[in-house]
Design a protein with these regions (language model features):
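Short, ordered, surface-exposed loop/turn motifs in non-cytosolic proteins
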Residues: 183, 318-335
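Structured interaction patches on ligand/partner-binding surfaces of diverse proteins
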Residues: 368-391
Length: 513
C-alpha cells in the first residue's frame, strides 16, 4: 500500500498555505487545517465523507499503541473515523476503526464512503504486491467484516481507488489491467438488482496512455473529480473535472491553482452542496508529514450550486416514535423506472439520499408489518442545491388506518390518471395482493375552488379511476370502495396555495383485513 497509494498521500499545496487558515491564490477558496482532533504528527491522508460531511473517515500512519513507534514511512496504514459536532463546529477526536475494517498486519486505506455513510470502500494490499478493493457495511452502529469485491471490480492486476455513483449501483474504479489504454485507467461497472456485476467498461474519453487515479463522483451524479499525469498536467498527477452529459463524459478541465502544483495532486472529495471539501496537504506548518485540510469554496451569488436535493431524515412508527428498519425505493415518476433503493440504518432509522434536479421523484417507504408511505420530491432543474430534513412516519396495518397517496396525479380538472401515478398504484396493488382479505376505501378530496356539487362529482370520478386501475390489475371489485368527499374533509386551510395543495389528495383507508 505504501508503494501503491503513496501518491494519494502527497497533495502538495504548501505554496498556498502559510498558516492553519489562509486564503489561497484564488480568493474563492479558503484552506483550513482540521486540527489535532483529526491530524497527528504522522501522515494523515485519504479523507472520505458522506454526502453532508457529517462523517469523516481517513487513513493514518500514526501508531495504534504506545509500543508501536516506527518511522512514518515504515508504519502500517490504518483507517480512522471522526464525526462532525455542530455545536462545536469541529470534528470529534479520531478513533481507530475495528479489525472488521482494519485487517491486522496489512495496510488498509479508506477510499470512498457512500452518500448515506453506510458503505465504506477500502483498499488493501495483498501478498503478491498488488492491491484490491474491499467493502464494509454499517449495521446499526457496527461495521461489518470487510468483503473483497468480486470480478470485474477486482482482477489479478492492481486496483487502487473506487467510488459508488449516487444510485449505489454504479461503481467507478481505477485498475492497471492490461486491457486498458495504458497504466492505470478509470473503469466502470454496474450491479443489477440480483447483485451481479456487468462487464467493466473503460472510460476511454478520460483515460490516456499515462496514469489516471483518485476517481470520485460528486453526489450530483454528473461531476467527476479525478487525477491524471496527462491532459496537460503541470507535473506528476493533477486534479481534473469532467461532466456527464447525455451519457458521455466531457473533456477533462484542470482545476488549476491552488489544487494543482508541480507535485502530485490526488484525491479531492466534496460534500453535496459543493461548498466544502477535504484533501491532504504536505505543509510545513501542519502537525505531521501530511495533514487533512478543509477546503471551503466561497460561492458567488450568481452560482446556484449543484442541481440536486439532499433528502435525509428518519423513518419511525407513527404511534410509538420507535425508529424503524425500512426500505426506500426511489422512482422516476415520468418513466416509472427505479432510480435506486436504499435501507435505513437498522438502529437509528436514518437515511440520506441525493436526488439530482429536473426529475419528479416518487419515494416509497416500506417496513415489515406497516403500510407503505409515499413522498413526492419534484425539484426543477434550475432550483440549485436544496437540503431537506424529512422524517417519515409509518402506520401499522390495522383496520381504520388511513394514508395519503402522495404520488397520485390527475390531469387538470379531470379524473384521468397521469402516467406518473402508475408506480404508486402498482405499490397499492401489490399491498392488496399480499393481504388477500384486505378491503379498502379509495377516497378523493378537493380544495374549496368550485362549487360543492362540482367538487363532489370530480372527486368521486377520481376515486373511481383509482378503483378501475386496481381492478385492471386483478384486484376484486368487492374489496374496493370509491368515495368522493369533495371539499368536506380539509386537512389544511384553503386560504393559501400550500393549504389547497394539501387538501387536493387521494387516500386509502383499511375497512377490514
Amino acid at each position: 500500500m505504501k508503494t501503491k497509494l503513496i501518491l494519494i498521500a502527497t497533495l502538495l499545496v504548501a505554496p498556498f498555505i502559510s498558516s492553519a487558515q489562509t486564503h489561497s491564490e484564488s480568493s474563492d477558496v479558503v484552506l483550513t487545517n482540521l486540527g489535532k482532533s483529526v491530524n497527528s504528527s504522522w501522515s494523515d491522508f485519504c479523507p472520505v465523507i458522506n454526502a453532508d460531511a457529517s462523517v469523516l473517515i481517513f487513513t493514518s500512519r500514526r501508531p495504534a499503541t504506545k509500543n508501536e513507534i516506527k518511522a512514518d514511512t515504515n508504519a502500517l496504514e490504518r483507517i480512522y473515523i471522526s464525526k462532525f459536532n455542530k455545536s462545536t463546529n469541529s470534528f470529534s477526536d479520531a478513533e481507530l476503526m475495528g479489525p472488521e475494517v482494519n485487517e491486522p498486519g496489512r495496510n488498509n486505506s479508506a477510499i470512498a464512503l457512500s452518500n448515506d455513510g453506510q458503505s465504506l470502500l477500502i483498499y488493501r494490499d495483498d501478498d503478491q504486491g498488488n492491491g484490491d478493493i474491499w467493502e464494509s457495511r454499517l449495521v446499526g452502529d457496527k461495521w461489518s467484516k470487510a468483503k473483497k469485491l468480486p470480478a470485474p471490480i477486482n482482477s489479478p492486476s492492481h486496483e487502487s481507488t473506487a467510488c459508488y455513483a449516487p444510485d449505489g449501483k454504479t461503481m467507478y474504479f481505477v485498475s492497471q489491467r492490461s486491457e486498458g489504454k495504458g497504466g492505470r485507467d478509470i473503469w466502470t461497472a454496474r450491479r443489477d438488482n440480483e447483485g451481479k456485476w456487468s462487464m467493466a467498461t473503460n472510460l476511454e474519453s478520460l483515460n490516456t496512455k499515462s496514469d489516471e487515479e483518485g476517481v470520485y463522483i460528486h453526489p450530483d451524479g454528473v461531476t467527476m473529480y479525478f487525477s491524471s499525469k496527462a491532459h496537460g498536467s503541470q507535473g506528476g498527477y493533477d486534479l481534473f473535472i469532467s461532466k456527464l452529459n447525455n451519457g458521455k463524459w466531457s473533456a477533462p478541465i484542470s482545476m488549476g491553482a491552488p489544487f494543482n502544483t508541480s507535485s502530485n495532486d490526488v484525491f479531492l472529495v466534496l460534500d453535496a452542496s459543493a461548498t466544502k471539501g477535504y484533501y491532504t496537504s504536505a505543509n510545513s506548518g501542519g502537525f505531521g508529514m501530511e495533514d487533512l485540510y478543509l477546503v471551503s469554496f466561497v460561492k458567488r451569488k450568481e452560482e446556484p450550486g449543484p442541481r440536486l436535493t439532499l433528502l435525509k431524515g428518519k423513518v419511525y412508527d407513527e404511534k410509538t416514535g420507535k425508529e424503524l428498519e425500512a426500505k426506500l425505493e426511489i422512482i422516476d415518476n415520468s418513466t416509472g423506472t427505479k432510480v435506486t433503493d436504499l435501507n435505513t440504518n437498522i438502529l437509528t432509522g436514518r437515511y440520506m439520499v441525493s436526488l439530482p434536479g429536473g426529475i419528479n421523484y416518487g419515494i416509497s417507504v416500506t417496513a415489515k408489518g406497516y403500510l407503505f408511505n409515499s413522498v413526492n420530491v419534484n425539484m426543477p432543474d434550475s432550483a440549485g442545491y436544496v437540503e431537506v430534513e424529512k422524517d417519515i412516519p409509518l402506520k401499522r396495518i390495522e383496520v381504520g388506518t388511513t394514508i395519503v397517496l402522495n404520488n397520485i396525479f390527475y390531469d387538470f380538472d379531470k379524473s384521468t390518471l397521469r402516467n406518473e401515478s402508475m408506480s404508486e398504484l402498482d405499490r397499492l396493488s401489490s399491498l392488496l395482493k399480499e393481504n388477500a382479505s384486505m378491503r379498502i376505501e379509495l377516497s378523493s378530496h378537493t380544495d374549496s375552488k368550485g362549487t360543492d356539487e362540482y367538487n363532489v362529482k370530480l372527486s368521486q370520478m377520481r376515486a373511481q379511476s383509482v378503483v378501475d386501475y386496481l381492478k385492471s390489475k386483478g384486484i376484486n371489485a368487492d374489496r374496493l370502495v370509491a368515495k368522493g368527499y369533495g371539499e368536506t374533509k380539509p386537512v389544511a386551510t384553503n386560504e393559501t396555495d400550500e393549504g389547497r395543495q394539501l387538501n387536493r389528495r387521494t387516500e386509502f383507508s383499511i375497512l377490514s383485513k
